[in-house]
């Protein structure tokens, strides 16, 4: 059974390990767990869970499964206690997370598939080798560790109206919601999932845990097919609503945090900000906290994310124009775009298009723009 005393005990125990992360005031407050040790909130639950293991459990070594962040938390916690650790990671986990996990002292087993496949492999190895399993979210001590964020928020943000929390398996939001609602039932707790991995949303909709057949999202940290049993029960009781955000919205939020707040967030960590940016949760006129749950994004992925975020916000436009394939037409198009104040970065000619006109081509122009209104103005100018 979860008790608030466990959360205070976890906070005391974790004071030796974790940092109390900063609050940055913006139109909303940002709880920057991306600045936490290992770059994610996951170190809280992992380290507290390991600290509560018996000597016998520690002697067997620990095993965990993870999309990446829990892995680093378990590796750090296990190494700090002198315990051997083995982590099962999805083969598609970002290279940065795989290497960081090894760097904290863990052995790594890469498993084809997604988080749920890594989970099954970890259970098999636990049964075969006798390891102690550290669940990434469906465990009372893990939830208590994550819930210390809720205790920090009560201390840091007075008169808080609502908190927006990324949701994968549900460990973070369960801990935060339990702590906040126990201390102040009037605080609203909203969860956010990627539309391509909305297992908790679906489960709450049908009033029972649902396992999705497939999941896919850039937010690898919350790419989970099925929520936990305990986390589902807590979310059902304490969470006010859970919404979804699209891939483009996540990318736009990552870009917003990077460009405006100078904060590097991974996809999962940016979902809370995306929900506020795109009006998925009712926050107007309220004091709201967005938990930026992690910042472990692979640099190669970040480049793609920035491009998608720029496109979503109208900072990059891809314009297709059908024109006669003759000298001077390209100059005309370029002149219109230049006059509108956009900067052309790439031009592609397609003479093999499906146009009914034989002597025509499709011109694809990629240009830097200011916003969506600017893109619309350029399109109108080209039509004229």
Task: Set out the residue ranges of the language-model regions.
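PLP-dependent amino-acid enzyme catalytic core
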Residues: 1-384
């Amino acid at each position: 059974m979860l008790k608030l005393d466990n959360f205070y005990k976890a906070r005391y125990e974790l004071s030796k390990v974790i940092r109390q992360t900063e609050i940055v005031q913006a139109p909303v407050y940002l709880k920057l767990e991306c600045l936490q040790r290992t770059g994610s909130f996951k170190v809280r639950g992992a380290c507290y869970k390991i600290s509560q293991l018996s000597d016998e459990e520690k002697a067997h070594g620990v095993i965990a499964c993870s999309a990446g962040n829990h892995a680093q938390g378990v590796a750090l916690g296990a190494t700090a206690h002198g315990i051997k650790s083995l982590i099962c990671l999805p083969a598609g986990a970002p290279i940065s997370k795989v290497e960081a996990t090894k760097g904290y002292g863990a052995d790594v087993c890469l498993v084809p598939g997604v988080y749920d496949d890594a989970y099954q492999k970890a259970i098999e190895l636990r049964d075969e080798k006798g390891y102690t399993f550290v669940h990434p979210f469906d465990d009372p001590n893990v939830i208590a560790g994550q819930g210390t964020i809720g205790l920090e928020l009560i201390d840091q943000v007075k008169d808080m109206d609502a908190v927006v929390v990324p949701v994968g398996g549900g460990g973070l939001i369960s801990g935060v919601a339990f702590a906040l609602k126990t201390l102040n039932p009037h605080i609203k707790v909203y969860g956010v999932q990627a539309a391509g991995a909305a297992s908790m949303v679906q489960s709450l909709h049908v009033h029972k845990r649902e396992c999705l057949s497939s999941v896919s999202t850039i937010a690898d940290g919350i790419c989970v097919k099925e929520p936990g049993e305990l986390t589902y029960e807590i979310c059902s009781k304490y969470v006010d609503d859970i919404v979804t955000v699209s891939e483009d919205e996540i990318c736009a939020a990552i870009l917003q945090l990077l460009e405006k707040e100078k904060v590097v967030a991974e996809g999962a960590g940016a979902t809370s900000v995306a929900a506020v940016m795109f009006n998925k949760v009712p926050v107007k006129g309220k004091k709201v906290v967005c938990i930026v749950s992690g910042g472990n994004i692979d640099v190669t992925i970040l480049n793609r994310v920035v491009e998608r975020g720029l496109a979503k916000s109208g900072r990059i436009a891809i314009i297709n124009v059908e024109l006669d394939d003759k000298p001077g037409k390209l100059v005309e198009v370029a002149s219109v775009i230049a006059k509108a104040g956009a900067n052309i970065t790439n031009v592609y000619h397609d003479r093999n298009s499906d146009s009914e006109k034989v002597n025509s081509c499709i011109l694809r122009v990629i240009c830097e723009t200011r916003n969506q209104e600017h893109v619309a103005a350029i399109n109108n100018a080209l039509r004229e």
